[in-house]
Amino acid sequence: MLGMEKYFINEDWSPLKVFINRPDGFRVIEEISYKPATEWKGSIQGKYAVYLLRKRGIDHFTVISEISKILHSKIHYIGIKDTNAITEQIVYTTNVKNIIEKYENDKFLLTFLGYSNSKFNHTGNIFEIEIETDDIKEFEKRVNKLRSIKYLPAYIGYQRFGTKRPITHIIGKMLVLREWQNAIDFLVGYPFESESELVKKARYAYMKGDLKEALELFPKRFRDERIAIKLLLRNENYFNILRNLQTPLIFYIEAYQSYLFNKYLSRIMDPTKIDENLVIKIPTSYDSCDSICREIFREEGLLNINFKIKELKLNVKDLVRKAYTLIRNLTIKDKKITFALDRGIYATIVIREIARTDPRLFT
């Protein structure tokens, strides 16, 4: 699923029933120079005004857009955090005059920390996850096994593809193939069982061609779906609709690259030959591929395709990523598993390896 074709630890583990109470049972703390962002101390002056953002159950782009309006400035960040979690991270702005000491609503808390003259060394993230399982002793045994191995394949986790609706990579593929209508159809249509009944009805209405009903049904937080439908009602073409979406289109293309990376990693990973410096490259064209990459590109129908979409002014870069990741400070106590991972590594790959079950149950 999502390119993750097999498990890493060579044990005949049966699936465990694992549940994580989202968002409250899943906490992510950004790590700055190997210390929690919550411990970062600012200076009394500097060219950046620095804030601690604590959010709960809200997606990254929505909260950044809201903060930008509150602070009347472009917001900079060093990592995109999980939507379905309680997360704490650094955000900063060059607007050092109009400081808001604290802002809070039901979704996020913004607290001014001070100033900085330099940007931040984002070393990773700390995860604190409360586990509910039918066999905690077996879960703890597997955690201890993982602690002895120390490494896991650096799969790109489920959040990158969408938690309730893991489809961002498919939209990305449609963009790469220049199939504009299909990209919009996958964005707005094709409901998943994990979605609410209201949203499923909205997507079904779109697929039936009832655009007005779909627009009425989609909640306001589904910004891009609503934008697409409104423009279709004005007879706008699909290419121009894509250009008007709020989510950056490169987000979808990078999700597709992530899917290809996972497929590649599944085919080369070996627990007996862990090379912590091994790097995998997913280039933007078939001609730049190695033999394994070419095999995957052929399977995906990408022989004469370039990921750099000039029509949309998207200068996509090669995806270069380490094959393996070190799991730091792994502990489990009172059904809470805690560990730190390097930047860009997803906690769900750790739980997936231990539980051997459908990650959508805990993503």
Swiss-Prot record:
UniProt entry keywords in alphabetical sequence: Isomerase, tRNA processing
Gene coding for it: truD
Reactions this protein catalyses: uridine(13) in tRNA = pseudouridine(13) in tRNA
SUPFAM superfamilies in the record: Pseudouridine synthase
Entry's EC annotation: 5.4.99.27
Disulfide bonds: none
Domain TRUD: 151-363
The protein's enzyme class: isomerase
Molecular function in Gene Ontology: RNA binding; tRNA pseudouridine(13) synthase activity
Catalytic site positions: 82 (nucleophile)
GO biological process: tRNA pseudouridine synthesis
Function: Could be responsible for synthesis of pseudouridine from uracil-13 in transfer RNAs.
InterPro entries: PsdUridine_synth_cat_dom_sf (IPR020103), PsdUridine_synth_TruD (IPR001656), PsdUridine_synth_TruD_insert (IPR011760), TruD_catalytic (IPR042214)
Protein name: Probable tRNA pseudouridine synthase D
Family: Belongs to the pseudouridine synthase TruD family.
